[in-house]
């Protein structure tokens, strides 16, 4: 405790024996031990009291924190945070009101200035030359017209070729037994009909095909009639000799 060695203790004991005497030394040592024990007890009591005080302080802190947590309200913190923003908004509103109020004053002061007489308007004569409302028409290029004429001539040539082929087939389908008078009469009649018919638009391929089929049917009927006439004549000739014999 006091950093005293054995040699120092021996020196102290010798001094005490010499000074105090051998008779009074034991009771003095007892009294010294009792005082040391009392001091130790006092120190222990002080420590216990100090520890209890620390514990109570810690408990008080804990209790205070718990009470703070219970009493904590987020709305209050939000209000505290929004207060500076509200102040800024109020300042901006006041600045805007101040900025608008001078403009109103200026407008009120400028009103009598506008009440002064206005100079009469000068009538400016309109110019004689007027521009057309629509832009001038641009002449179309001749190339598209030539292309259109070539495209129109191609279907005409194709139609003429198809008509020639259909007529050739109709002529080939006619029977050889038709008399020359009919053969001679048909071109004349066709020429007459063609001359009598008014100028009509060129027939399409479908109409030409229909006409060719009609001509084929008429030719077949005429062939059947021509074949039936010689058969009837032969039958009548054969019937006449039988009657003569009877």
Swiss-Prot record:
It is a single-pass membrane protein. Residues 97-112, 187-197 have a biased composition (Polar residues). It is found in: Cell inner membrane. The chain crosses the membrane at residues 1-21. The keyword Transport applies. The keyword Transmembrane applies. Residues 94-122, 179-204, 225-246 are annotated as: Disordered. It comes from the Bacteria. One of its GO terms (cellular component) is TAT protein transport complex. GO terms for biological process: protein transport by the Tat complex. The Tat system comprises two distinct complexes: a TatABC complex, containing multiple copies of TatA, TatB and TatC subunits, and a separate TatA complex, containing only TatA subunits. Substrates initially bind to the TatABC complex, which probably triggers association of the separate TatA complex to form the active translocon. Part of the twin-arginine translocation (Tat) system that transports large folded proteins containing a characteristic twin-arginine motif in their signal peptide across membranes. Together with TatC, TatB is part of a receptor directly interacting with Tat signal peptides. TatB may form an oligomeric binding site that transiently accommodates folded Tat precursor proteins before their translocation. This is Sec-independent protein translocase protein TatB. It comes from Agrobacterium fabrum (strain C58 / ATCC 33970).
């Amino acid at each position: 405790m006091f950093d005293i060695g054995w040699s120092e203790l021996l020196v102290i004991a010798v001094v005490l024996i010499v000074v105090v005497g051998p008779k009074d030394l034991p009771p003095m040592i007892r009294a010294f031990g009792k005082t040391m024990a009392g001091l130790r007890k006092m120190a222990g009591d002080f420590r216990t009291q100090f520890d209890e005080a620390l514990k109570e302080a810690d408990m008080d802190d804990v209790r205070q924190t718990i009470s703070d947590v219970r009493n904590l309200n987020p709305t209050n913190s939000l209000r505290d945070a929004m207060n500076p923003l509200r102040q800024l908004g109020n300042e901006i509103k006041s600045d805007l009101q101040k900025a608008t109020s001078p403009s109103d004053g200026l407008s009120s002061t400028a009103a009598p200035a506008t009440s002064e007489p206005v100079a009469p308007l000068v009538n400016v004569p309109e110019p004689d030359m007027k521009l057309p409302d629509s832009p001038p028409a641009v002449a179309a290029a001749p190339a598209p017209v030539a292309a259109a004429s070539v495209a129109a001539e191609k279907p005409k040539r194709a139609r003429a070729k198809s008509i020639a082929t259909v007529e050739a087939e109709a002529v080939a389908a006619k029977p050889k037994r038709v008399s020359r008078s009919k053969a001679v009469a048909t071109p004349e009649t066709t020429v007459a009909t063609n001359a009598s018919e008014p100028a009509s638009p060129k027939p399409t391929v479908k109409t030409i095909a229909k006409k060719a089929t009609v001509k084929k049917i008429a030719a077949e009927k005429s062939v059947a009639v021509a074949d039936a006439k010689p058969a009837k004549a032969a039958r009548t000739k054969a019937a006449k000799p039988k009657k003569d014999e009877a």
